[in-house]
């Protein structure tokens, strides 16, 4: 690794430890040329599957799009940022765990709904109404009834 201070290529690792619940390695390094110390972080590069849209088009997984939908559903609801981050992390983990290179967008929507159901029932109904394109109040009532079962 190049030293950020003198750009030399010779550095040594002084200390390594796991951080971020074991998902990241923090390394303390020292340059052998200028003796400056610096910290690096190492994480695994995990590729998300491509998304197969309902019209058959394929596109890269867009985390921002998913997060935006979740945040709109949870707007002005009493859910902590940590709980939201955990839900997003769980959705991404489940997508990677499929082992598939491509997943239907419907699967992502269902995973989001599953997480929202646990986070906040109102947010779940908000998301479901858009995701399932509710046409009238009856459909809202049916979804609420299913939620209460």
Swiss-Prot record:
Alphabetized InterPro entries for the sequence: ATP-cone_dom (IPR005144), NrdR-like_N (IPR055173), RNR_NrdR-like (IPR003796)
Zn finger region (unnamed): 3-34
PANTHER family: TRANSCRIPTIONAL REPRESSOR NRDR
Positions of the ATP-cone domain: 49-139
Protein's recorded name: Transcriptional repressor NrdR
Membrane-spanning residues: none
Cofactor note: Binds 1 zinc ion.
Alphabetized Pfam families for the sequence: ATP-cone (PF03477), Zn_ribbon_NrdR (PF22811)
Protein family according to the UniProt entry: Belongs to the NrdR family.
Cofactor entry: Zn(2+)
One BP term from GO: negative regulation of DNA-templated transcription
Protein's job: Negatively regulates transcription of bacterial ribonucleotide reductase nrd genes and operons by binding to NrdR-boxes.
Record keywords, A-Z: ATP-binding, DNA-binding, Metal-binding, Nucleotide-binding, Repressor, Transcription, Transcription regulation, Zinc, Zinc-finger
Domain of life from the UniProt record: Bacteria
Molecular function, one GO term: DNA binding
């Amino acid at each position: 690794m190049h030293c950020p201070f003198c750009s030399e290529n010779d550095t040594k690792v002084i200390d390594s430890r796991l951080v971020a619940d074991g998902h990241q390695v923090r390394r303390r390094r020292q340059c052998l040329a200028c003796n400056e110390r610096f910290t690096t972080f190492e994480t695994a590069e995990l590729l998300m599957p491509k998304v197969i849209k309902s019209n058959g088009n394929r596109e890269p997984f867009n985390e921002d799009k998913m997060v935006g939908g979740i945040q709109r559903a949870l707007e002005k609801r009493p859910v902590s940022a940590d709980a939201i981050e955990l839900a997003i992390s769980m959705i991404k983990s489940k997508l990677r765990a499929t082992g598939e290179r491509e997943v239907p967008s419907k699967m992502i929507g269902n995973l989001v709904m599953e997480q929202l159901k646990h986070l906040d029932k109102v947010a779940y109904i908000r998301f479901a109404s858009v995701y399932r394109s509710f046409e009238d109040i009856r459909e809202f009532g049916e979804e609420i009834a299913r939620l209460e079962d």
